[in-house]
Regions:
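A short acidic, Gly/Pro-enriched loop at the edge of an enzyme's catalytic core
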Residues: 137-153
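A short glycine-rich, Lys/Arg-flanked "PGG" loop and its adjoining helix->strand segment in the class I
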Residues: 167-183
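Class I S-adenosyl-L-methionine-dependent methyltransferase module
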Residues: 61, 65-132
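Conserved S-adenosyl-L-methionine
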Residues: 46-49, 70
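Residues lining the SAM
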Residues: 155-159
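Acidic carboxylate diad motif detector
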Residues: 189-191
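Class I SAM-dependent methyltransferase Rossmann-like catalytic core
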Residues: 2-42, 54-62, 74-85
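Class I S-adenosyl-L-methionine
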Residues: 193-238
C-alpha cells in the first residue's frame, strides 16, 4: 500500500491525496450515464479521464467509435500497472470502513475489486493492441478539432475531486469539452467523495461565460457513492 494513494481519514468520505486509477467497465458507464448501446452505434464518443477503464475497449468492439483521453497514456503498460494496482489496493482496504457507500451493485469490497481488476485488465490488453484509441494529454486542453465528437463523457473526475481541482479548472474544462463536442457532455458524479453536491454546480449555471450552454442534472438508477444518482448534462443552446 505504500506506493498507492494516501488515504486521509479525518473526513466522513473516502479521502484521497490525488486522482486515483480505478478501472470501470462498459456496464458501469452505461449505468452512470444512462447509455443505450444500440443508440450509440456509429457515433463518436470521447471518454475524458478514461484512465484504466475498459469502456473504450468494450465499446469499440460493439461498433461505437470511442476515443479515450488521459494523462497516463504517455506511459507504458508496465508503468500504468505500477500505478493502478497499488491504487486499487489502497481503496479496497479502506472503502469497506467508509459510510458513504451503498453495497447494492457491488456486493462487497471484494466484488468491487474484482470488477475494477477486470476492467483494468481489458484496458491494458486494448491499450497494447489499439494505441490509436488512447490519446495522452491533460485538461483543460484537448487535442481535438471543434465538434469532433457526438458525445463526451467524464467519469469520476472534476466534481468528485473539487478539493483538488479549482473552479477555474472546472470552468475551463467544460468550455474545452464543449468545444470538441457537437452533441452533449455528461459528467458523473455531481457529488464529492463526501457524498455532498459539488459547490461548483450553481456557480457554473450562473457563470456569464457559460450562458451558451444548458445545464441539467439527470437522474439515474445507479448509486454506489451516496447521492451519486445523477449526472450533469451539458448541451449547446440553440
Amino acid at each position: 500500500m505504500s506506493n498507492g494513494a494516501k488515504l486521509i481519514p479525518q473526513k466522513r468520505g473516502l479521502q484521497l491525496d490525488r486522482v486515483v486509477l480505478l478501472g470501470r467497465t462498459f456496464d458501469e458507464y452505461c449505468r452512470y450515464f444512462l447509455l443505450e448501446p444500440e443508440e450509440l452505434a456509429g457515433k463518436t464518443v470521447l471518454d475524458v479521464a478514461g484512465g484504466v477503464s475498459s469502456f473504450c475497449a468494450e465499446a469499440n468492439t460493439r461498433g461505437i467509435r470511442v476515443t479515450s483521453f488521459d494523462t497516463i497514456y504517455s506511459l507504458t503498460p508496465e508503468e500504468i500497472v505500477e500505478r493502478c494496482d497499488p491504487d486499487l489496493d489502497s481503496v479496497y482496504h479502506a472503502i469497506g470502513q467508509v459510510p458513504t457507500y451503498r453495497w447494492d451493485y457491488y456486493k462487497s469490497p471484494e466484488h468491487m475489486r474484482e470488477l475494477r481488476k477486470r476492467a483494468s485488465t481489458i484496458f491494458l490488453s486494448d491499450y497494447k493492441a489499439h494505441p490509436q484509441h488512447y490519446i495522452s494529454g491533460e485538461l483543460p486542453r484537448l487535442p481535438f478539432e471543434n465538434s469532433s465528437f457526438d458525445l463526451t463523457l467524464v467519469s469520476y473526475f472534476l466534481f468528485a475531486y473539487q478539493d483538488y481541482l479549482s473552479y477555474e479548472f472546472h470552468h475551463a474544462s467544460i468550455l474545452e469539452i464543449m468545444r470538441v463536442t457537437q452533441g452533449e457532455g455528461r459528467i458523473y458524479p455531481t457529488v464529492t467523495f463526501e457524498a455532498q453536491p459539488s459547490k461548483y454546480l450553481p456557480l457554473l449555471r450562473s457563470d456569464p461565460a457559460l450562458q451558451n450552454f444548458d445545464f441539467a442534472e439527470i437522474k439515474t438508477d445507479f448509486e454506489f457513492l451516496l447521492n451519486s444518482n445523477s449526472f450533469l448534462r451539458v448541451r449547446h443552446k440553440a
